[in-house]
Amino acid sequence: MQIKIKYLDETQTRINKMEQGDWIDLRAAEDVAIKKDEFKLVPLGVAMELPEGYEAHVVPRSSTYKNFGVIQTNSMGVIDESYKGDNDFWFFPAYALRDTKIKKGDRICQFRIMKKMPAVDLIEVDRLGNGDRGGHGSTGTK
């Protein structure tokens, strides 16, 4: 699969083909300082044209909280195929739990390409006809 990618400028670190794993790291496009309890959109310096029928899932790297003390406010970002303009640059929505500095080039999040959900028709019924499994957190408690 080929994906067209545009970089914010010539100083952005180019994304190389991944050698292992299923996720591709993204880097901060500029230095960002965030105070505790502050929200900022961290620019990632890339815009992409995703293939028709696909979307990108963007999540923090496993070390993002440890290294920077930030969490991604929407848990997982979804970028669909329509977000593909020359100025549709990607961002990481960060909420800081401590004062922090993210430097240009720091690996802050990762993404993978996924097929979009097919068209779904929801059919209302009075009963599903299945046994109840249990509530939240009930798996493995019996």
UniProtKB/Swiss-Prot annotation:
| E.C. number(s) listed in UniProt | 3.6.1.23
Gene Ontology biological-process annotations: dUMP biosynthetic process; dUTP catabolic process
Q: Which Pfam families match?
A: dUTPase
Which keywords annotate this record? Hydrolase, Magnesium, Metal-binding, Nucleotide metabolism
SUBUNIT field: Homotrimer.
Record: residues binding dUMP: 62, 74, 83, 91
Transcription among keywords = no
Q: State the InterPro entries in the record.
A: dUTPase, dUTPase-like, dUTPase-like_sf, dUTPase_trimeric
Catalyses which reaction? dUTP + H2O = dUMP + diphosphate + H(+)
Q: Which residues form the active site?
A: 80 (proton acceptor)
- Name recorded for this polypeptide: SPbeta prophage-derived deoxyuridine 5'-triphosphate nucleotidohydrolase YosS
Cofactor(s) essential for the protein: Mg(2+)
Give the family from UniProt: Belongs to the dUTPase family.
Function noted in UniProt:
Involved in nucleotide metabolism: produces dUMP, the immediate precursor of thymidine nucleotides and decreases the intracellular concentration of dUTP, so that uracil cannot be incorporated into DNA. The Ser-62 side chain changes its position upon ligand-binding to make contacts with the nucleotide phosphates.
* Free-text cofactor note: Binds 1 Mg(2+) per subunit, coordinated entirely by the nucleotide and ordered water molecules.
Q: To which species is this protein native?
A: Bacillus subtilis (strain 168)
Q: Does the keyword Acyltransferase apply?
A: no
